[in-house]
Amino acid sequence: MDIGIFIPIGNNGWLISSNAPQYMPTFELNKQIVQTAEGYGFDFALSMIKLRGFGGKTEFWEHNLESFTLMAGLAAVTSKIQLFATVATLTIPPAIAARMASTIDSISNGRFGINLVTGWQKPEYEQMGLWPGDEFFHTRYEYLAEYAQVLRDLWATGSSDFKGEHFSMQDCRVSPRPKADMKLICAGQSEAGMAFSAQYADYNFCFGKGVNTPTAFAPTAQKLIEANEKTGRNVTSCVLFMIIADDTDEAARARWEHIKDGADEEAIAWLSEKGSADKSAGSNLRQMADPTSAVNINMGTLVGSWATVARMLDEVASVPGTQGVMLTFDDFVKGVEDFGEKIQPLMTSRKHIAQLKEVV
């Protein structure tokens, strides 16, 4: 099973709590995290894009780096790990995104790919006059399909004459083209989102579910398998989990409870309000806005000792259609080190990393 890191491009990572580590996103922080992850054999690193935060006393996600430029910098200081930037497709034309990706492909020597997002948080786009209207909630995957087709055309042939409802290319060109096969990620969970991923993506990003229920996402992975049957492609799932690990189950649980006790209710309420605006939202967005465990945006959470977390991650790997997991931590620097030293060596699904290190 592949292991990735969802790097903290926004302040405070993925914890909406005053009891969690409070920090600003910087290039140096993310460089340290990704270089450490690369040293422990992580397969990929992905950065999101966020253009406006949730407010509250923690100013959650009010401070964010930009995804493509961050990953370009990280491409220059890494050598093996695959890197994915996220493009907010309402903000950057596909031909420009294709050229940016080709540039980072050159910097990284073929280790770059793109995560495509349509945009669900209206204030991110309204603030710069780019929100197309609420009807976009219903047509966004049609828009994204055209966007992805233009990308594929330009990367495959260097030119595009695509004509659609949203984009019109006229002998549009990109050169040099990427040397590697450019991979696309999408996070579609609605019926339209799954259909898009099965047609255009290489991996589909989904949320884990619940606390210490590592296989609860299995129905989502199964829906993707069924969508693949209609397209004849083999798009696999990549599942997001937060790791809260310690020497004992009790110590890890105490830390998790302390984080929840400091929940920034104002920021969480803002998330719930904006998340409910998209009536056509898939399960990911509805899950994010659910107040049940919104302190970490309701991503799947694995809490326990090193051995407990290793066992649960191996359970994740057993779900059909699962390519890998993408991890977040309460403390990213320590979390990556603890994973590499104390959790990964106990994982059956990562035995190949230990064997590789023995050979080296």
UniProtKB/Swiss-Prot annotation:
FMN binds at residues 49-50, 115, 124, 140-141, 190. GO terms for molecular function: alkanesulfonate monooxygenase activity; uracil oxygenase activity. Keywords: Flavoprotein, FMN, Monooxygenase, NADP, Oxidoreductase. It is an enzyme of class 1 (oxidoreductase). It comes from the Bacteria. SUPFAM superfamilies: Bacterial luciferase-like. One of its GO terms (biological process) is uracil catabolic process. InterPro entries: Luciferase-like_dom (IPR011251), Luciferase-like_sf (IPR036661), Pyrimidine_monooxygenase_RutA (IPR019914), SsuD_RutA_monooxygenase (IPR050172). It catalyses: uracil + FMNH2 + NADH + O2 = (Z)-3-ureidoacrylate + FMN + NAD(+) + H2O + H(+); thymine + FMNH2 + NADH + O2 = (Z)-2-methylureidoacrylate + FMN + NAD(+) + H2O + H(+). It holds the Pfam family Bac_luciferase. Its EC number is 1.14.99.46. Belongs to the NtaA/SnaA/DszA monooxygenase family. RutA subfamily. NCBIfam families: RutA. The FMN-N(5)-oxide reacts spontaneously with NADH to produce FMN. Requires the flavin reductase RutF to regenerate FMN in vivo. This is Pyrimidine monooxygenase RutA.
